[in-house]
């Protein structure tokens, strides 16, 4: 029998953004157009100066131009685009500079509020700058005075985009080409937080005055039922309550409704901005203490401290007529109020696993 040894977890592997993929493929295709040879890899420089060699799946002539493709490698990050083919189709243009186009699988901006104008292909500013810089250097090396027409595409991007926030943000037809550093850090969650900020910005730019930030589908459904809010007003915050609350400091709305499962809201009430179990946990003694302030018996408090889950503690409290759900929401509102500007009206709702409302706290405003 093989002797057991302690597991030594391997370090998580970083990957490359779609912006890096778009840069590498644009450079390879443009180089071929300007007399270069077909190669199976291309070197690019990332925004912070790192040089990386990216493998190409193909680099070939295409219609009146050239095209190149690479497989997106997200490393150990759970990225929806991992393994997708990102490609660039490049033609020479008469005017200097780069004109960008949305190829198959890349979306187009249809709503104001993003960093790109309505009608623009969803190729974000930093990837655009990376492509422009590399093609300008190539043109200078080859003595080429014209410009480039660059279309970026992602195979299957239209279908993959349905798994992202793009449809809600008004980016239609495909994915966005993203990245600020060129590198995907495993579990950094930066893209998700950026999508939360974009969701708020798009809602504001389209005249939405009341948004609901929700931890999941059940809480979104609860807010739809209560207010009939349009999709653009529903912000899928997941575990990142802090991303919503802090962004409202510089991008306020008239009213914010926070809604989530009772356990998530109890974490917010306890002063946590990241509601994921990796970063915060349910504080059952704290729940028992709040129940005590509402007149809970000593026996109930002891029972709540020994509960297996927050839902069990909530059920125990409600069985004795202790309005723990409302109290937790009130504590969460008080904590959030310390972050959000006073001009933003706040309310907090908690739901159970069936989506039923189990607590609420709403500010009264004259």
UniProtKB/Swiss-Prot annotation:
The family annotation for this protein states: Belongs to the CbiD family.
Name the Enzyme Commission number(s) assigned to this protein: 2.1.1.195
What Pfam families does the record point to? CbiD (PF01888)
Which regions form coiled coils?
none
Query: Mind listing the UniProt keywords for this protein, alphabetically?
Result: Cobalamin biosynthesis, Methyltransferase, S-adenosyl-L-methionine, Transferase
Top EC category: transferase
Catalytic activity, as annotated: Co-precorrin-5B + S-adenosyl-L-methionine = Co-precorrin-6A + S-adenosyl-L-homocysteine
UniProt-recorded Gene Ontology molecular function terms: cobalt-precorrin-5B C1-methyltransferase activity
List the protein's name: Cobalt-precorrin-5B C(1)-methyltransferase
Q: Which domain of life is it from?
A: Bacteria
Instruction: Give an example GO biological process.
Output: methylation
Record pathway:
Cofactor biosynthesis; adenosylcobalamin biosynthesis; cob(II)yrinate a,c-diamide from sirohydrochlorin (anaerobic route): step 6/10
């Amino acid at each position: 029998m093989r002797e057991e040894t302690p597991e030594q977890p391997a370090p998580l592997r970083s990957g490359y953004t779609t912006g890096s993929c778009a840069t590498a493929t644009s450079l390879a295709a443009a180089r071929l157009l300007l007399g270069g040879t077909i190669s199976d890899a291309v070197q690019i420089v990332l925004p912070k100066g790192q040089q990386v060699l990216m493998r190409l799946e193909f680099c070939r002539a295409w219609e009146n131009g050239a095209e190149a493709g690479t497989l997106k490698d997200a490393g150990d990050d759970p990225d929806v685009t991992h393994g997708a083919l990102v490609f660039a189709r490049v033609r020479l243009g008469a005017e200097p500079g780069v004109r960008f186009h949305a190829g198959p699988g890349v979306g187009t901006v249809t709503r104001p509020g993003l960093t790109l104008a309505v009608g623009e292909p969803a190729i974000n500013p930093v990837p655009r700058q990376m492509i422009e810089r590399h093609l300008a250097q190539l043109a200078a090396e080859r003595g080429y005075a014209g410009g480039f027409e660059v279309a970026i595409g992602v195979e299957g991007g239209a279908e993959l985009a349905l798994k992202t926030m793009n449809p809600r943000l008004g980016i239609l037809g495909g994915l966005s080409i993203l990245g600020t550093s060129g590198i995907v850090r495993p579990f950094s969650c930066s893209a998700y937080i950026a999508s939360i900020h974009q969701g708020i910005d798009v809602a504001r730019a389209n005249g939405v005055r009341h948004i609901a930030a929700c931890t999941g589908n059940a809480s979104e459904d609860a807010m739809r039922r209560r207010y009939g809010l349009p999709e653009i007003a529903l912000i899928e915050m997941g575990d990142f309550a802090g991303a919503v609350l802090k962004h409202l400091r510089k991008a306020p709305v008239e009213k914010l409704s926070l809604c989530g499962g009772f356990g998530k809201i109890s974490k917010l009430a306890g002063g946590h901005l990241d509601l994921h179990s990796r970063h915060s946990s349910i504080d059952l003694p704290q729940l028992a203490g709040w129940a005590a302030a509402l007149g809970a018996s000593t026996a109930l408090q002891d029972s709540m401290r020994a509960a297996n889950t927050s839902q069990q503690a909530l059920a125990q409290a409600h069985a004795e007529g202790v309005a723990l759900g409302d109290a937790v929401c009130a504590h969460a509102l008080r904590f959030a109020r310390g972050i959000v500007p006073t001009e933003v009206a706040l309310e907090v709702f908690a739901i159970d696993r069936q989506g039923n409302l189990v607590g609420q706290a709403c500010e009264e405003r004259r």
